[in-house]
Every structure is written in C-alpha cells, then in structure tokens.
Swiss-Prot record:
Induction: Up-regulated by both hyper- and hypo-osmotic shocks. Keywords: Endoplasmic reticulum, Membrane, Stress response, Transmembrane, Transmembrane helix. Residues 688-700, 776-819 have a biased composition (Low complexity). Changing residue 418 to A: Viability does not decrease in a calcium-dependent manner. GO terms for molecular function: calcium channel activity; calcium ion binding; mechanosensitive monoatomic ion channel activity. This is Mechanosensitive ion channel protein Msy2. It is found in: Endoplasmic reticulum membrane. Disruption phenotype: Upon hypo-osmotic shock, cells display excessive increase in cell volume compared to wild-type and undergo cell death. Residues 90-100, 148-151, 247-449 are lumenal. Residues 392-427 form the EF-hand domain. Changing residue 399 to A: Viability does not decrease in a calcium-dependent manner.
Amino acid sequence: MNEHRREPHRRSGYQDDSAFTNTEKLVDELDHNVEPEQLLEKNRTDFKLMYVIVKFYRWFNNLSFITRWITIWFPLAGALVIPLAVGVSPYPNAKLGGVRIFWIFVWLEVAWGGFWVSRVIARLLPYILYPLMGILPFTMYKYTVILTALEMPLAIFFCSIVCVCTFSPIMIGKGNFTSTTVTTTTSATATPTASASSNAVESVFVTKTAASVPSWIKVITKILGAAVVTSIVLLLEKIFLHFIGFHYHEVQYQYRITDNKRNTAVLAKLLTAALDAPYHDSPRVRRQDYLLGLIDTRSMSESKGSGNGKLRKVKKISKNAKRIFSKTRNAISTAFTDMLGKHAKDLTPEQEFILETIRSKKKCLALARKIWYSLVPEGEDCFQKEDLIGLIPDDEINDIFHILDNDYSRTVTLDEMEQFTREISIEFRSISSSLRDVDLALGKLDRVGLGVVGIIAVLTFISFLDTSFATILAAFGTTLLSLSFVFSTSAQELMSSIIFLFSKHPFDISDVVIVNNIKYEVVSLSLLFTVFRTMGGSTVQAPNSLLNTLFIENLRRSQPQSETITIVSPFATDFKQLERLRDLLLTFVKENERDFRPIIDLNVSDFSTLDSLKFTVTYYYKSNWQNVSLQCVRRNKFMCALKNAIATTNLPAVADPVRGSPDYPFVIEQYNLERPEYSKTASRPQFSDISSTASSNSLSNKPGFAHSESRNYHTHDEDNSSDDNHKREDRGHLPAQYLRQSVATWQIPNLISAIEAYDSQNESSQENATYTVVESNGNANGDNTATNSQGATDNGQTTTNTTQNNVDNTQATTDNTQANTDNMQVAIDYSQNMDGQIQY
C-alpha cells in the first residue's frame, strides 16, 4: 500500500515541514505495528537529559537562599582568584596601568562579594525593621512590606556604595604613585674654633599629589560617583512604582483575594469529603469523574491492541513530551530568578487540581455536581448540615455550611452548589485577568519611569565627566522646553490615565458598569485606555483620560440592589386594592427567598392631573446585578408575579378603548335614517389615543354634528334628472353623524337614556313628515280627477299648496331636530360633568 501511494504535487519553494510532521511519523510507525510501549521507552531515552535538568533544578530550588547564592557567587570568585594568585608569587611586581595586578583583582573580588553581601542585607532588612517599626502606627508599619519588593534596587544601591568607598583606598592607597621632593637645610653652630663652618643637611620628602594619579583611576572614580547618584534615582523610582502597586493591590484586591482563597479552601475540603461520602461510587459521580479526568474508562471501552488505543497513547506521548519541554523551558528561564529576587512557591497536588478545575467552566460545574451527587442520594433535592458530620471536622462544618447556604434555608440545592463553584471560577479568572492587566500597566509605567531615570543618568554621567556641563545643560533644557509644547497633551493624558487607573480605579476586569446610561462589561485594562463590551456584543474602546471625567456605576461593587416599577391605574383605585396587591407580592417574594429579600415597598407617587393614579412597586434582590443572566431570570419571574397579582386584585387598566368590552371605553355610532347611503360611504374619524378620563377638545368647538366642509361624500349612480335634485337637497342636509365616545362604565346609563330619547324624537318627527307628504299627494290627485275643466289652475294651486305643506313640514322637522339637538347637548354636558368623553 505504501509503495503505490501517490506523492502530492509540490510547487517550487514549498516547504514540506509542518506542525504535523512528527505526528505523521508516529502514525506511520503505528501502521508498521510498532508497539506504543517501545515508543514511550524511546522518548524517555531521548528526553533523559531534560529529565536530569528538571530534577537538578528542583533539587537546587529547594535549597536555602544562602546556599544558592554561595553556589552562584563561587564560580566567578574562583576565577578571579587565579590572576590574584599570579600577582602574589610569580610576578609580584606585575602592574596594570601603574597599579599592581594583585590590588586590581582584590578590588574586583571586593565588588563581586559586596554585591552578594548587599543582597543578603537587602533580604534581611525587612525582618530587621519589622520589630523596630512596631512602635509606629500601623499605616507606617504596613509599608515596610514594600522593602521585600525592593531587594534588587537596594542591593544595587548598597553595592555602589561599597564600590565607591573601596576603590580609592585600594587603587590609590596601595598604588606606587609618588613624587619626590628634596629639601636642603643649613644650620650654623657657634664653636670656639677660629673659623666658622656650616653644615648642609638634605631632607627628602615623599609626597603623593593628584597629578601623579593615572587618569583612568580618576575616570573610574567619577563613574562610580555617578553610579551612586543613578542608583539613588533608580531606588526612588522603584519605591514610587511599588508604592502605587502596593496601594492598588491593598485597596482593590486584598479582600477579593482573601475571599477567593477561603472559598477555594472550602471547595477543596468538600472535594475531600466527597471522596469518602456514602454515594461517591454511584454512576452519576463516575460520569462527573470522567469529565474531570479522575478516572480512565479506556480499559472498559477498548482493547489493548486497538488502533484507537494506540492513537491515544501516541497523543499521551506527545503531551508528555510537550510537558517536558515546558518544564525544561521553565527551568532554563528561571535559572536567574534568584539573581532577580523572584521566588516561586510550589503548590500541593490538591491545590493544583482545584486551580486547574476552576479555570474551566465545564470542569467547574462537573466538580460541583460530583460533590453534590456524592452527598445526596438519588431522588433527593438537597443536603443538610447533618450530612457533613463525619466527613468534615465538627468545628468547620458551621463555617462551611454558612458559606454555602446564602438564603439561610438550612439546605443546599444543586443550583446553589453550581452557583457557588461558578462564582469561584468567575472571581478567580477575573482576579487573574485584572492582576495581569494591571501588572502590564505597571510594566508600561515602569518603562516610562526607567526612561526618565535613563535621561537623568545620562545627565549625571555627563556632569561628572565633562567640565562644560553648564553649556550642555542649557542646550538640553532649551530642547526639552521646545518639546514640552509638542507633548503637553500627551503628558496630560498620561498623568490623567495614571491617576484614573491606579488611584481611582473604578472597575476591574469582567465588571459590569454603566457609563452614560449604557451597560458595559470591562474586557481589558491598559495604561491609556480601557476596552469594554456592550450587552449586544460590540467592542468599545475608551481613553482613560475621558473616563476620568465621567460618572461610572459599578454593579459588581454594589450591594444587593433593588428595582422600582411605576404603574398607572384609574383614579378610582382605592387603598384596599393597593394593600391587596402588596400582600400578594410580599407572599411571592417570601416563597422565593433564594432570589428576593422579603421586602415590598408600594408608594403612591402622583395623581396631580386627577385623571389617573401613579404608584411604584419596589422589590429587593438577594444580590447585585453583576450576573446579568441571573438578574434577567429573577426580573422576569417577578414581573410575571406582578401581572398575576394585578389580575387577582381586579385593578382596572388605563388603556385605549376596546370595542365590545363592558369594562373598557366603547364606541357609539348614529346614522342618518333619511339618507342611509351617506352613512355607508361617510368617512369616519380615526381612533385617537386617549384615556377613558381624558377631556375631548371637540366638545368645546361644536357639540353636535361634525363639520361637513372637510369631508367628501359620494352617491350611487342615478338619473341625470334626479342628480340635480339630490345636489340641491344635499345643501340642506348635514352629513351622517358618527359619535365616538369613551366613557367609564358608571357613566353609561345616563348617556344611553339621553341618546334613546334623542333617537325616539327623531324617528317620530320623520314619520310625521312622511305621513303629511303622502296625504297631500292623495288629495291633489282626487281633485284633479273630479274637476277636469279647471285642471291646469287646480293642479297649479295644488302643487303650490303641496310645496307649501312640504316647506312647513320641513320647518317643523328642523325645529324638532334643533330641540333634540339641545336635549343631546344637555346629555353631553351632563356626561362631561361626570368626567366622560365624547369625540366627533
């Protein structure tokens, strides 16, 4: 099969090496029936050197710091002894720059040893100052902790002092730099001799002047002096930086880290108790163990020589190799941690398992279920304090159960256990992310500080080495002054960001905050900006200098919060209905004490317009709104309970009228019975948004029929002769009436009685007018048949009389209509006084 395998086409310049090359080789070896045990043994042989390095590092790291430092100091010190020994015996007069080699390497030994002695002093200084600072207030005593973080800057400062104090005595004091001065003195003595004589005495004075010292010694002396000044500036910068970091961690994370450690310890104790619980071997627990990786089910599901088993073993070999490489890299990268003043603390296997578990959401929930299933038999929904007796020491049961039982129900459900572990996981990841981002911000601030220290160091060295320092300083000051106008805005933004992030620090990673009435979640922190995520998922970046001027509401740091809901009810709502509503809501929150506090505040806020009554319902959560999903579930639960309580109390609603409902406003329609075609085609007014007790503006304008100028009416197809008659008649008739009224239920009887009286009077007047017209026409026809000779004259007279009668009847109908309209206006005024509404 392998011989006939087709090679894939490779283009020019294509590299065959990939990340899966080693895995493909391992799979090919499996195809050739290579046993996984042989591969494992082969990899152990290949990684033997790495195992040795890791083992040596662990052994070396477990030694005391004195032993480690002596081990690091000894190789270089031994190397410096070789030229020192050469300058003692074989070549005692060997010199370097006018100084014997022996004294040069003596000073190098002193400098190298002084560095490690300074390390020891800097390490022991906090332990020495703790008892001495105990007499001071605690606010000063706690700052001695900063000394533990200043070990390296203090060591550099002490070492520079040692170097500058020992260089001149050794190099100049032991060097052969002499200038000989010969002085001759003559003394006269009085003797009883015949001649006077004088004796000349020559005196030789050996002096050492500055001119005789080599120039390189002068230069090194100046360099060491500048190094002392630079070390002082560096120490001050580190003190300032660590003071900011200490204050930040103390204020922001002291209690959070303490609480998280306490909860993690409780979780570890519960896990230990679950291993010895009565139901620790149930199928439910074993499923959670498989998710946690505590058991290996491959032996039950696969044979020894199956391909899947081999592939899993290959993956295991690759994972072990990766772990070995990681350990080797850590060993190499931490080889100089002792020199940098950093120390790692090993964790116990239990702590490592808990910390690894709470980093994963799935494993975190599996751990909670494992503990709960181990303590609770199948069919039960909670466990009590008595279930922990014998598994946890008696003096710790009360504290542990107090932490788990947040609602004081004396039981712990599965939801509470999952919520407990979920909060530990979220808090742990939040603290880790916040500390990481803050450390990065401190690192950036440290780089800025080191840049300033570097500039000061350059100026310091120039001032020590150059005599014309004043000229250089003037030129540098002019340049700095000109650049200040360019970077003034950036410098101001930097200072505002530093104050906002390290002094104010209104939020941390994963906090839910409200800025400008918009809810955000903090994603990351930086020195100059902050990244947020909206509830919709979009990412927002805001400069810290701008956030420094805004009001920020932090939900995570808030205490258990409350929410207020405003409800509008009819003005006729009484006190008993409100108290009934409050009692129902209070019963609901007591039944759901895991979510709400047993408090309900109901307050009437406003009824100034006398058309409605506004009141507020305030309920209290058991926690803040940091967990958005949990807050939404609780709010929906309460809103549904509020809806049911309002329906139970029969509280009337204030809403738009609904046709056909007896409890809500209704619509009345009145048509013109004389011309029904107008009623069918008349355009009706739109349904406006008014309440049942709002006043109608149309009442004050024209109570009665609606205006006809703004509406168009159409008629059916008729003869041309009758169209003109209809048009003439339209001028005397008003359009069809459409009365829309929105009133309360208790106003209906009076209004209906007035409308019925109006309708009955209108119908009777129309019947009388029709009867009169018919009777007049009959009499006219009889007269025409009896008197044929006077047909034209009589017909003309009859027509005149009929027309006059129609005019009289029409006038009577108009008078009746006006009277009915007045009656209708009286009914309307009465209804309006009763707070009704009529709209035309």
